[in-house]
Amino acid sequence: MIVAKKYFLVLSFLFVQFALLPQAFSADKGWFDTLKDNVSETWQQPEHYDLYVPAITWHARFAYDKEKTDRYNERPWGAGFGQSRWDDKGNWHGLYIMAFKDSFNKWEPIGGYGWEKTWRPLADENFHMGLGFTAGATARDNWKYIPVPVLLPLASIGYGPATFQMTYIPGTYNNGNVYFAWMRFQF
């Protein structure tokens, strides 16, 4: 039963990621050209600079032995910097680099491009929610700091320049299955 729940959860996250991918890319161009253009525009014409502050990592208890979760660090401290912009549809694009203490309390850098389809469901335009993805690379101590590509879902809720942004890293038993969240302050 736990295995079925685990696979359902992983497949759900993958489905959401791939369901949102086409919205990030224009219908006129291929997805790679659109991605390249969005990254380039975010790099060359940022509207904001962002401060990233890691808030929490949580290891899904259904996917880990208790003795492992008892040893893991779930309070990552660190910081990051980025630049971002809002496109003409109101969607968020960002380039970022962040370093934080991982599950083993070792430094883990991550950097990449993020995109979120953004909704402003209230009359107050400052309140916003988003769903999207991030693509980039990370490196970990237990993998000898060899860069590893990442493609992960993103979700956020925010008010004005402060956004609580999060992802879920899928995995297998005693590996992965981690919720990771951070604050993003836009300047």
Curated annotation (Swiss-Prot):
EC primary class: transferase
Record flagged with keyword Coiled coil: no
Site, as annotated: Role in lipopolysaccharide recognition: 68
Compartment annotation: Cell outer membrane
Gene3D superfamilies in the cross-refs: 2.40.160.20
Coiled coil feature spans: none
UniProt signal peptide: 1-26
GO-annotated molecular function: acyltransferase activity
InterPro entries: LipidA_acyl_PagP, OMP/PagP_b-brl
Active site (UniProt): 59, 102-103
Keywords: Acyltransferase, Cell outer membrane, Membrane, Signal, Transferase
Site, Role in the phospholipid gating: residue positions: 173
Reactions catalysed, as given in the entry: a lipid A + a 1,2-diacyl-sn-glycero-3-phosphocholine = a hepta-acyl lipid A + a 2-acyl-sn-glycero-3-phosphocholine; a lipid IVA + a 1,2-diacyl-sn-glycero-3-phosphocholine = a lipid IVB + a 2-acyl-sn-glycero-3-phosphocholine; a lipid IIA + a 1,2-diacyl-sn-glycero-3-phosphocholine = a lipid IIB + a 2-acyl-sn-glycero-3-phosphocholine
Annotated EC: 2.3.1.251
Heme in keyword set: no
Physiological role: Transfers a fatty acid residue from the sn-1 position of a phospholipid to the N-linked hydroxyfatty acid chain on the proximal unit of lipid A or its precursors.
Family designation: Belongs to the lipid A palmitoyltransferase family.
Protein name (Swiss-Prot/TrEMBL): Lipid A acyltransferase PagP
Organism: Citrobacter koseri (strain ATCC BAA-895 / CDC 4225-83 / SGSC4696)
